[in-house]
UniProtKB/Swiss-Prot annotation:
Its EC number is 2.1.1.256, 2.1.1.-. It comes from the Eukaryota. The gene is THUMPD3. Its main location: cytoplasm. PANTHER family: THUMP DOMAIN-CONTAINING (PTHR14911), TRNA (GUANINE(6)-N2)-METHYLTRANSFERASE THUMP3 (PTHR14911:SF13). GO terms for biological process: tRNA methylation. This is tRNA (guanine(6)-N(2))-methyltransferase THUMP3. Signal peptide: none annotated. One of its GO terms (cellular component) is cytoplasm.
Length: 507
């Protein structure tokens, strides 16, 4: 994010045709704009609003308002803090608020309501939000230019050939000398990984070329901005549809600014968020969700990075904690943890070799990106991937501080019938490896009936302290926060005289 921080000190001129007049930001306006206070809205995973608010308070020092419309938070910042907003890990999309109406009075008929939307466009305070949008746009342009320079340097090394081999030998030497795990080293030497790396570099170079070509054209030939209006509506007492509101409000915005409407290749996205009687007009600051990070090899049930971050925050990791995801899938949770909590060690495990392979590929890809960005060999990441059986983990008793995992829902993976055998066995094995008294577990599942039943039989080793209800791919799921009790683990064979009868994960 250093590119973004540097961009705040030097803005690019962008023509905004407001009432057929050009509004530009110059160096003389920079001081006043850096002190400008604006309201930023952010969409977050439904159910993790409070977690996102805590992150904003911790990293930006700003208090948050959680919207009545679930999945949104609002906070006030100065424009100079815009770079840090893009570094938030718990938010999906960002937008700057133009104006908020807490109790908007809708008329009785559709025609009257739509006419009010048309009149609203010319009454809104667009000036400051558009300045924020221009600063945000300058971030992307400067980032693309710097990215092209870095990638060209990487391309020269690749074409040279010898330097790449030297770099790889140096990386391998650094890895070996510091005793990093053998799994990452093996995958780094894997021909498939090398092919993925070269493909990644080629794609980035091509995209950078397109972006810089477009930016050079804009600098030489300023054009009228293209825009679209997106209406997000929730509530049953509205006499209009989302498309009707977007159409009429968008038409008024077009008449006011003389912009060109374009539903796909737009420069500005105007948001019209309606929830019951609450109406908020904003301008989008992100083109795609910020949860699209870290993962390059996807599986059938890849967890969103923002959800993974929210789950990790619930367990409050401390320095030097051992954090394990025993059913990691593509490794979204451990990878998110390794990037944000680098002073902990993260273990990603799964019984499926394909899942372990995806997780290892994602780890190697993230490491390679870090090396390309820094231009030198990396010390590695505090993470490892391993294949194991969740019901018989190759870990010492009481050796794990935190367990965070996404349990099989029984929908796309596994089955609800198998969960009745799997969940009790998982909780029992987790209680064995987790440290008594201080150990924590954060578990996500949609099969709440099965989990509640399994947990009721484990009350002597697990104590539930919180339940967070979230939306995962349209499914209502629960995140259970558990604390390991001081009760020492007792093997079932010592209780029943029968070894392993309750420890088998039945298929």
């Amino acid at each position: 994010m250093c590119d973004i921080e540097e961009a705040t000190n030097q803005l690019l001129d962008v023509n905004l045709h407001e009432n057929q007049k050009s509004v530009q930001v110059t160096e003389s306006d920079l001081g006043s704009e850096s002190e400008l206070l604006v309201t930023i809205g952010a969409t977050v995973p439904t159910g993790f609003e409070q977690t996102a608010a805590d992150e904003v308070r911790e990293k930006l020092g700003s208090s948050c308002k959680i919207s009545r419309d679930r999945g949104k938070i609002y906070f006030v910042i100065s424009v100079e803090s815009l770079a840090q907003v893009h570094c938030l890990r718990s938010v999906d999309n960002l937008f700057v608020v133009v104006q908020e109406f807490q109790d908007y009075q809708f008329k009785q008929t559709k025609e009257e309501v739509l006419k009010d939307f048309e009149d609203l466009a010319g009454k809104l305070p667009w000036s400051n939000p558009l300045k924020v949008w221009k600063i945000n746009a300058s971030f992307k342009k400067k980032k693309a230019k710097r990215k092209k320079i870095n990638q060209n340097s990487s391309k020269e090394k690749i074409n040279n050939g010898q330097e790449v081999k030297i770099d790889q030998r140096n990386v391998k030497k650094e890895f070996t000398s510091h005793a990093l795990d053998s799994h990452i080293l093996d995958y780094y030497e894997n021909p498939a990984i090398k092919e993925d790396v070269s493909t990644l570099i080629g794609d980035d170079l091509a995209s950078c070329k397109d972006e810089t070509d477009e930016s050079s054209k804009e600098e030489t030939e300023p054009q009228v901005l293209k825009f679209r209006v997106t209406c997000n509506r929730a509530g049953e007492k509205h006499c209009f549809t989302s498309n009707e509101a977007a159409r009429d409000f968008g038409g008024a915005v077009q008449d006011y600014f003389k912009w060109k409407a374009d539903m796909t290749n737009f420069d500005v996205e105007v948001l019209l968020n309606i929830h019951d009687n609450e109406v908020i007009v904003g301008i989008a600051l992100t083109e795609e969700s910020l949860h699209r990070r870290n993962i390059t090899h996807f599986g059938p049930t890849t967890l969103r990075s923002t959800l993974a971050y929210g789950m990790l925050r619930l367990c409050d990791p401390l320095p030097y904690d051992i954090i394990v995801d025993p059913m990691c899938g593509t490794g979204a949770i451990p990878i998110e943890g390794a990037t944000e909590w680098s002073d902990c060690f993260h273990i990603a495990g799964d019984n499926n070799p394909l899942a372990v392979n995806r997780a290892a590929n994602n780890i190697a890809s993230l490491l390679t990106k870090s090396q390309i960005k820094e231009g030198k060999p990396s010390w590695g990441l505090p993470i490892d991937a391993v294949q194991w059986d969740i019901c018989n983990l190759p870990l010492r008793t009481g050796s794990v501080d935190i367990i965070v995992t996404d349990l099989p829902f029984g929908k796309r993976m596994g089955s609800k019938k198998r969960n009745w055998n799997l969940y009790p066995a998982c909780l029992r094995e987790m209680s064995r490896v987790c440290t008594p008294t201080t150990g924590r577990a954060v578990l996500l599942t949609q099969d709440t009936k099965c989990f509640t039943k399994a947990l009721s039989g484990m009350r002597h080793v697990w104590r539930k302290v919180d339940t967070v209800w979230v939306n995962v791919g349209g499914l209502r799921a629960a995140v259970y926060v558990l604390i390991r009790t001081p009760q020492a683990f007792v093997h079932p064979s010592e209780q029943d005289g029968e070894r392993g009868t309750l420890w088998q994960c039945k298929e």
